[in-house]
């Protein structure tokens, strides 16, 4: 599971998710990629589930690059607690993904295998995605 080794502040503001990605919008490591077409928070569990779905389908052939990292903490109050009395305890970690970001990349496999592996991974994610090739995105 992806989590930061250490952070300066345990609790963060939620922030805004407006506009397109400023960087990370091209396929740079592999030959094929999975690009987000909507913006959303992606948890470390969702990233891991997508990674497992891809590697199981590819049967350990090829290579997978994960280009997003869950560096932002999110908080939640316990069930049944009344409003007020401070911010809740840190609950987990998320990667804020804007539209246009290439989240996963694959290499060393043919296009049909890559397309199916990334399709399976996309079902584990809360964003709409599209398949991109190197040089296109």
From Swiss-Prot:
Gene3D superfamilies to which the protein is assigned, alphabetical: Ribosomal protein L10e/L16 (3.90.1170.10)
Cross-referenced InterPro entries: Ribosomal_uL16 (IPR047873), Ribosomal_uL16_bact-type (IPR000114), Ribosomal_uL16_CS (IPR020798), Ribosomal_uL16_dom (IPR016180), Ribosomal_uL16_sf (IPR036920)
Subunit note: Part of the 50S ribosomal subunit.
Pfam family, one: Ribosomal_L16
Biological source species: Lactococcus lactis subsp. cremoris (strain MG1363)
GO biological-process terms attached to the record: translation
Cellular-component GO terms for this entry: cytosolic large ribosomal subunit
RNA-binding as UniProt keyword: yes
Keywords: Ribonucleoprotein, Ribosomal protein, RNA-binding, rRNA-binding, tRNA-binding
Descriptive protein name: Large ribosomal subunit protein uL16
Family: Belongs to the universal ribosomal protein uL16 family.
TM regions (residue ranges): none
Cited SUPFAM superfamilies: Ribosomal protein L16p/L10e (SSF54686)
Molecular functions (GO terms): rRNA binding; structural constituent of ribosome; tRNA binding
Role of this protein: Binds 23S rRNA and is also seen to make contacts with the A and possibly P site tRNAs.
